Design a protein with these regions (language model features):
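Alpha/beta-hydrolase superfamily serine-hydrolase fold, recognizing
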Residues: 1-287
Length: 287
């Protein structure tokens, strides 16, 4: 028997991966991103694609240059639910780029995406950032320092790097505490020198500037935050999320938090339930 199916003239549910887009070149270092977009975006003359809310995803990497493609298979589902997703890389601390290089890069990526919003079918007024581990540290800092001139480069300077929602998965919220907890991990001290420089007298101030728990202040115009963390995390202590939640909540900010029972760092943290919670949250806040 020959079965019959209808075609898909609107390309509904089809996702396009646009690889190795250079969004900036800093100190001779090309910075890349990958974009997941609806297939119709590829054929603007044949198809109209309504602007979609954007998710900027920052992969955890211990503040090195993260692997952009690691979460691509999981992120496809968000495009099928009406988003454009960009996974962005940043300069690596171990290559000599101290804090706040990674933060400046992620903010530059956001401004680039707003600048190219029409090309990639992005609604520049609906932008969320989502990060994991060190990428979640970057995401939190982006949310807490929107358009802060200290972290703004000259690239696409007319665009805003503010975001409309932040999703943080197992982020270092208290950087000194994170490094203390992982003191026995090989390379721990070297990474601190890479992030904060050779003058250790400056480390406390630099660590504070990189710690969302220290950066957050009352009376600011912050976006809503979704915090998620495994209570068996062996890399970033779970209590850091609790402390961050309590601080934001006490100061009257829009914040939700989830404890993932028995979950370590990455790996068994992830489940379809986690992705569904993130999707539902973003649908409420930016869609």
């Amino acid at each position: 028997m020959i079965h019959e199916l209808h075609n898909n003239p609107e390309l509904t549910g089809q996702v396009r991966l646009i690889e190795n887009i250079t969004y900036a070149a800093v100190a001779g270092c090309p910075l890349k991103m990958q974009i997941l977009a609806p297939w119709t975006q590829r054929y603007p003359k044949q198809y109209h694609t309504d602007p979609r809310p954007l998710i900027v995803f920052v992969q955890g990497s211990s503040w090195r240059t993260g692997r952009m493609g690691e979460e691509i298979p999981q992120l496809v589902q968000f495009v099928k639910h009406g988003y454009v997703v960009a996974t962005v890389q940043h300069r690596s601390a171990i290559d000599g780029f101290t804090f706040p290089a990674f933060l400046k890069d992620v903010k530059t990526a956001i401004r680039f995406l707003r600048h190219k919003a029409t090309k990639y079918a992005i609604d520049p007024h609906r932008v969320a950032i989502w990060g994991t581990s060190s990428g979640a540290n970057a995401a939190m800092l982006v949310g807490l320092t929107g358009d802060d001139p200290r972290y703004k480069s000259h690239l696409y300077a007319h665009e805003s790097d503010r975001v409309d929602a932040v999703v943080s998965c197992f982020a270092p919220m208290d950087v000194p505490d994170t490094f203390k907890a992982s003191a026995k991990v090989p390379g721990n001290k070297l990474l601190q020198f890479c992030l904060f420089g050779m003058d250790t007298s400056k480390w406390p101030a630099e660590m504070a500037a990189m710690s969302p728990l220290d950066v957050a202040e009352p009376g600011q115009d912050y976006p809503p935050f979704l915090l998620m963390h495994g209570d068996a995390d062996q890399v970033v202590p779970y209590h850091e999320m609790v402390d961050m939640y309590n601080k934001l909540d006490k100061d009257g900010y829009d914040v939700e938090a989830y404890r993932v029972k028995g979950a370590n760092h990455e790996r068994d943290f992830w489940s379809q339930q986690v992705y569904d919670i993130v999707l539902d949250y973003l649908n409420q806040k930016v869609k």
